[in-house]
């Protein structure tokens, strides 16, 4: 399977003698717990250390339940429609969500360190580079949906920073190199789904008749991050900027 992490976890639990439904439920629950913990840590970081722990807990719970903006005439139900959770949602999507939070965190921390220490001392160490490359590759192996949105957003953000700080070219080349393994994984996944002659592939078609609907669906999902991006232009926190740009993309 081209999204093997969730299936690998289920397979390992099956070796212990558990039934398939129980193993699948436990692995899915584990990923959701990791997502909540990562969201809680993210909220503590954004709220500041002076805030109460329960405030971050409430925010993390809301984040884990948030969906697209509900417009009754467009998406009148909770369980159906674009960007909404439903009972049949892919478990591999649940597996990638913790990686999405971790990737955002690591990338933002890396750039904050670069800005603080400067081009000479702010570059990634070998261990940091390997860790970042492995994390993003694992995210792609869980499911490439996060990286499909994040990589274009991050590329635009860091291209602007590279133009502003050309003396930091070594650091930006390090970031590009760290993304290569995940890009290779995504290329293999694309080949398997769309180009490889198998019975399990996905047909890729483009329909101009549905273009307007797709734009409207994407807009509904991006309304809140777009609002945050427009109304808080002076925000300097790298983590916030990357999170919002990722949500919009």
Description of each model-found segment:
Residues 32, 93-104, 149, 153, ...:
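Hydrophobic core segments of transmembrane alpha-helices in multi-pass, intramembrane catalytic enzymes
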Residues 16, 65-66, 138-145:
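Transmembrane helix irregularities
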Residues 26-50, 102:
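Transmembrane-helix motifs of polytopic, lipid-linked glycan transferases
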Residues 53-111, 211-218:
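Membrane-interface micro-motifs in multi-pass membrane enzymes
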């Amino acid at each position: 399977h081209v999204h093997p992490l969730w299936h690998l976890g289920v397979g390992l639990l099956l070796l212990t003698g558990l039934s398939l439904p129980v193993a699948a439920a436990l692995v899915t629950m584990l990923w959701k717990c990791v997502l909540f913990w990562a969201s809680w840590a993210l909220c503590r970081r954004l709220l500041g250390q002076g805030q109460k722990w329960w405030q971050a807990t409430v925010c993390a719970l809301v984040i884990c339940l948030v969906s697209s903006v509900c417009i009754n005439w467009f998406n009148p139900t909770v369980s159906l429609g674009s960007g909404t959770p439903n009972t049949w949602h892919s478990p591999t999507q649940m597996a990638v969500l913790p990686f999405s939070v971790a990737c955002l965190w690591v990338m933002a921390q890396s750039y904050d360190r670069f800005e603080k220490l400067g081009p000479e001392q702010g570059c990634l160490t070998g261990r940091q580079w390997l860790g970042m490359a492995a994390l993003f590759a694992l995210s792609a192996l869980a499911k490439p949906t996060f990286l499909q949105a994040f990589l274009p957003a991050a590329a635009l953000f860091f291209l602007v920073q590279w133009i502003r700080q050309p003396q930091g070219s070594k650091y930006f080349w390090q970031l590009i190199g760290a993304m290569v393994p995940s890009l290779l994984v995504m290329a293999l996944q694309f080949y398997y789904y769309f180009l490889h002659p198998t019975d399990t592939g996905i047909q890729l078609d483009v329909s101009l008749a549905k273009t307007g609907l797709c734009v409207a669906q994407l807009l509904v999902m991006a309304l809140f991050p777009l609002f945050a991006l427009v109304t808080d232009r002076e925000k300097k926190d790298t983590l916030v900027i990357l999170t919002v740009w990722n949500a919009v993309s």
